[in-house]
From Swiss-Prot:
Family under the similarity heading: Belongs to the SNF7 family.
Residue numbers spanned by region Interaction with VPS4A: 170-181
Alphabetical list of InterPro entries matching this protein: Snf7_fam
Lipidation (N-myristoyl glycine): G2
Organism domain of life: Eukaryota
Subunit field text: Probable core component of the endosomal sorting required for transport complex III (ESCRT-III). ESCRT-III components are thought to multimerize to form a flat lattice on the perimeter membrane of the endosome. Several assembly forms of ESCRT-III may exist that interact and act sequentially. Interacts with VPS4A; the interaction is direct. Interacts with VPS4B; the interaction is direct. Interacts with CHMP4A, CHMP4B and CHMP4C. Interacts with SNF8, VPS25 and VPS36.
Protein name from the UniProt record: Charged multivesicular body protein 6
Protein transport in keyword set: yes
Species, as recorded: Homo sapiens
Domain notes: The acidic C-terminus and the basic N-termminus are thought to render the protein in a closed, soluble and inactive conformation through an autoinhibitory intramolecular interaction. The open and active conformation, which enables membrane binding and oligomerization, is achieved by interaction with other cellular binding partners, probably including other ESCRT components.
Organismal lineage: Eukaryota, Metazoa, Chordata, Craniata, Vertebrata
MF terms (GO), sorted A to Z: protein-containing complex binding
Motif Type-2 MIT-interacting motif, chain ranges: 168-179
Length: 201
């Protein structure tokens, strides 16, 4: 049990993943380099101003040449970063294409297996059997319809009408009055009087 739950999952990092990680690390290093150079250029520009104020024009000019060279380095660095990002995007898109192709291949294999189970011949056989069953039932219906005379048809319709009439007829309401029930709590002496009233009515 311990080995079962303690087993480490196998790494699913591919060579493409490693390449993407390495390219992104190089890109990040170049961006850090850009940031340092940009900060240095600001300092050198401020220093060149100070040198001009101090009357040291040649020194300021030399510093500006150095600054210009570093700006060119920044442009080259930006181009390198763009190339790295394009490479990363290309690899990532290729990975997506590979997954799509794997999905298409899996789907194609499933379709092939289904076609093996249900071939065209099998489908045609089932359709033929279905058509035969329908035709057989039609022939039975025709035989049954032709075996009855007009007298039989009339008798069947008459019986059907009688059954229908039985279902819709309701029982009649009784015309005789219901016998009057003498309440149990009426005194015994009063009961003959009630019987006389009923007879008189």
């Amino acid at each position: 049990m311990g080995n079962l739950f303690g087993r480490k999952k196998q790494s699913r990092v591919t060579e493409q993943d490693k390449a993407i990680l390495q390219l992104k690390q190089q890109r990040d290093k170049l961006r850090q380099y850009q940031k340092r150079i940009a900060q240095q250029l600001e300092r050198e520009r401020a220093l060149a101003r100070q040198l001009l104020r101090d009357g040291r024009k040649e020194r300021a000019k030399l510093l500006l040449k150095k600054k210009r060279y570093q700006e060119q380095l920044l442009d080259r660095t930006e181009n390198q970063i763009s190339s790295l990002e394009a490479m990363v995007q290309s690899i990532e898109f290729t990975q997506i294409e590979m997954k799509v192709m794997e999905g298409l291949q899996f789907g194609n294999e499933c379709l092939n297996k289904m076609h093996q189970v249900m071939s065209i011949e099998e489908v045609e056989r089932i359709l033929d059997e279905t058509q035969e069953a329908v035709e057989y039932q039609r022939q039975i219906d025709e035989l049954l319809a032709g075996s009855f005379t007009q007298e039989d048809e009339d008798a069947i319709l008459e019986e059907l009408s009688a059954i229908t009439q039985e279902q819709i007829e309701l029982p009649e309401v009784p015309s005789e009055p219901l016998p009057e029930k003498i309440p149990e709590n009426v005194p015994v002496k009063a009961r003959p009087r009630q019987a006389e009233l009923v007879a008189a009515s």
